[in-house]
């Protein structure tokens, strides 16, 4: 088992890395959403052909396939980053509680 200080350092570094990754995923998701919205607005201004709203909606969706794919990829990355961040936060909490327990145990033993 790792010494407590090493556990704290490792957990803190892991949490910092997870926070950086999460911030990047949030930014990438927002950018993918903006790209989709801009592309959709552009196509709507240009006009989408079709007999009715349903057909025009389907054609619009087909035209925006790449943008939707980018958004779904960004959503998946964001979900993963959130999970990794939560795990890192739990590991950090566990390391802190272990140190606190060790401190309490050491105080009682004296």
Outline where the language-model segments fall.
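Extended, low-aromatic, Leu/Ala- and acidic/polar-enriched alpha-helical coiled-coil segments
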Residues: 12, 61, 65-76
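Terminal low-complexity, poorly structured segments
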Residues: 1-4, 32, 39, 56-60, ...
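Extended alpha-helical coiled-coil "stalk/arm" regions
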Residues: 25-61
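Generic detector of low-complexity/intrinsically disordered segments
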Residues: 7, 45, 62-66
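Long amphipathic alpha-helical coiled-coil segments
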Residues: 21-22, 26-35, 69-104
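Short acidic DE-rich linear segments
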Residues: 105-110
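Short, charge-rich amphipathic alpha-helices with coiled-coil/heptad character
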Residues: 1-20
């Amino acid at each position: 088992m790792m010494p407590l200080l090493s556990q704290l350092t490792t957990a803190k570094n892991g949490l910092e890395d997870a926070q950086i990754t999460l911030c990047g995923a949030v930014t990438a998701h927002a950018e993918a959403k903006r790209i989709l919205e801009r592309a959709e607005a552009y196509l709507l201004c240009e006009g989408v052909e079709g007999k009715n709203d349903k057909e025009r909606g389907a054609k619009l969706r087909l035209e925006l396939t790449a943008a939707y794919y980018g958004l779904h990829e960004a959503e998946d990355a964001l979900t993963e980053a959130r999970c990794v961040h939560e795990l890192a936060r739990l590991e950090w909490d566990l390391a802190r509680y272990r140190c606190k327990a060790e401190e309490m145990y050491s105080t009682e033993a004296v």
